[in-house]
Amino acid sequence: MLRPPNPLVTIVAALAGLNWLHARAVRWAIRRNLTRLWAGDPEPLLATYVDDVHFTFPGRSSWAGEFRGKEEVARWLRRFVRVGLRFEVHEILVVGRPWDATLCLWFTDRLTDADGGVVYENRGTIMAKLAWGKIVSYEVNEDTQKVAALDAYLAAHGVNTAAAG
């Protein structure tokens, strides 16, 4: 298991042109925080957001919207956890300097029923802007028709689909 790099070393390395070390630190933090999210704890991930974070989820589903600020994003993330969605990270790419970095995360998310059958699966990307290790803005892009079908499945099975956490 990778140990987290010292933040000061990461900044100095990035300033010296060692962007790979900065990228490694960001990838490590994202994986750690997503693992905590799946365990039901969104707080470590939320701690990496600026207070006025901007999150976009396109489409015409109950998940879609423009969310501004940690509280709005926190409600969305808590709902994600409450519904039981799981997220598999395939790749995390990070480019740029600590004060202006771009992150691209390629993932598959899915929901299984009580018998372990997959009832929803979708592949997508997250594009994010970061500054000094904090997420400033991000957008999730995946098949919006599959997300709408997830809404229908949840409603048909009596799962609370209210967007509020």
Set out the residue ranges of the language-model regions.
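Short, cysteine-centered beta-strand-loop-beta hairpins and adjacent loop/turn segments enriched
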Residues: 110-121
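A short, polar/proline- and glycine-enriched secondary-structure boundary/capping micro-motif
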Residues: 66-67, 116-117, 146-154
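Hydrophobic/aromatic beta-strand elements that line small-molecule binding cavities or substrate pockets
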Residues: 89-94, 108-109, 123-129
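Short beta-strand edge/turn micro-motifs at domain boundaries
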Residues: 2-6, 123-152
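Short, low-complexity N-terminal intrinsically disordered segments enriched in polar/charged residues
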Residues: 1-47, 156-165
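Hydrophobic pocket/interface hotspot
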Residues: 33, 44-46, 53, 69, ...
